[in-house]
Amino acid sequence: MADDRAKHQAVERKALALGKWANLFMAFAGIATAWASRSDAMLVDGLYSAVNFASAIAAARIGARVGLPPTRTRPWGHDFDEVLYVTFRSLILIGVLVFAAFVAGTKIWTFFSGGSVPELVFGPIALYAVVIVAICLGLALNYYRAYRRTGKRSSILKMESRAAVIDGALSLGSGAALLSLPFLEGTVLGPYVPIGDAVIVLVLILAIIWQPLATFRTTLADLAGISAPSGTHAKAARAARDVAREKGYKFHRAAVLQAGRMHWVVVYLDPEQPVRADEVDAFRDALAARLEDRIGPTRLEVVVTASDGLAHPRS
């Protein structure tokens, strides 16, 4: 198991390192293209890549700590670091999109209030869109391949793959739409071409903001200590019940939490007979091995008690 964890961490590190430098290149390219083309959409794209670059650095450090054994200063290990990372990563992405909406809205307001709006330069946009979409597609495939090789358990790789898809969608959508704006000249929409990129930004934001919002809601539930998904809980409880039956113990219930790729399971049981500490340890080891196969990496605690550990309403 330790060898597998080391291999998975190596795969994750390699994928994140490639993503880090790719995003740094895309950040500079996006900001340079925004300056050359006077496009807010390109600026948003560049800022999004800059956030991805900074996040990749943090993700690599956090990924190396996940799964380490508890210490005196971190008695519960580092597993929740991954959840914290994904939570704040989602918040930052939401913040970038909100900032982009504000910039686009300001440009539209300036236009309709009679202010001056700079004319777009379309030349640099075409080259940028082709190069960046190709890079984002490659990154998304690289992250997803690493995600599968690590057993589909890394929330970091899953989040980065989604971020690469969003970045590619931003580049493709904004690039294609911006390049189509000159064709509106001479039509009823011709007078609005100067704010075309601002409108495109707002449409793209409405299309993709649901992804970081959904991720934020999921990780917030993990941080709040809400029970793991029903399917995961059912598998853990079934495994605990089976092992308890084999040992002749009475199974009360299992409490299951999820922290990124790690699961936390507490099993409440009543041996209904005198037991030694090493027998409880043997039960824990047998169940831990079974849970590892059923639901993935697990930290397990066993509570020997006559009750199920739940608060019951007073009669």
Regions found by a protein language model. Name each.
Residues A2-R5, V11-L18, A41, S55-R65, ...:
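Alpha-helical transmembrane segments and adjacent TM-loop junctions that form the membrane-embedded core
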Residues A17-G30, A101:
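The first (N-terminal) embedded transmembrane alpha-helix
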Residues G30, W35, T298-L300:
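Generic low-polarity alpha-helical segments
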Residues A32-D45:
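Short, hydrophobic transmembrane alpha-helix segments
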Residues Y48:
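Active-site cores that bind ATP or allylic diphosphates and position pyrophosphate for catalysis
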